[in-house]
Amino acid sequence: FSPNVSVTSEALETSSTATANYKKQEGSYFDSMFSYGLAYDKRNSTYQPSDGYISRWYQELPIVADGSPIINGYQIKGFRSLADNSVLSSGIFTRAANSLSGEDVRVSKRLYIPASKLRGFEYGRVGPKDGAEFVGGNYMATFNTQATIPYFFDTFENIDFVAFFDAANVWHVDYSSTVGDSNKLRTSAGLAVDVLTPVGPLTFSLAQPMSKAKTDQTEVFRFNLGTTF
């Protein structure tokens, strides 16, 4: 159980080219939020696991917040050993952003696909688009699977070479009926190098998008620093 309380204040501004619906969200906002996570870990190791799974439920609730936003999420990732010391891992990651008061979810609370969950695409430039702005979605889901590639050098024990496949979608715009939902599956495949360092895991990846919406922005190379979950 991992509880957290956050207090934030923000001022939302829009450009002169923003649509009328987007401009309606301009203003100052104050949020006091309570969030928590519940995890169930059955991995055989927290460091480079080769068997088992870990699942996590996440919820963010308003204490005092404009628009009363609520975010629910669930994720699960499993591991299985293959031949030649290779490990297959697959995971699902989901989020939903809504409002307890029935109001529209403002732009800063909307959902974007995490950079590590959809390689081959620019972060924050995938999904619903209002005019020139990518505005995120109310719902988001990803599926990721990868397998480590065997190698023959013991000195590389902190490095994994992997082949991966990513699939993701972010969709629905509650504040406007004229903005397209962008409800389309995005997919990519590629190769990556995961390096475990004292400051955390580093990932270098080369990805090729396989399916996309016409407005999505792609990229071939990606560098990530952060969690492996």
Model feature map: region roles:
Residues D174-F229:
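C-terminal beta-signal and terminal closure region of outer-membrane beta-barrel proteins
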Residues N4-I159, A163-V173, T215, F223-T228:
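C-terminal outer-membrane beta-barrel translocator/porin domains of Gram-negative envelope proteins
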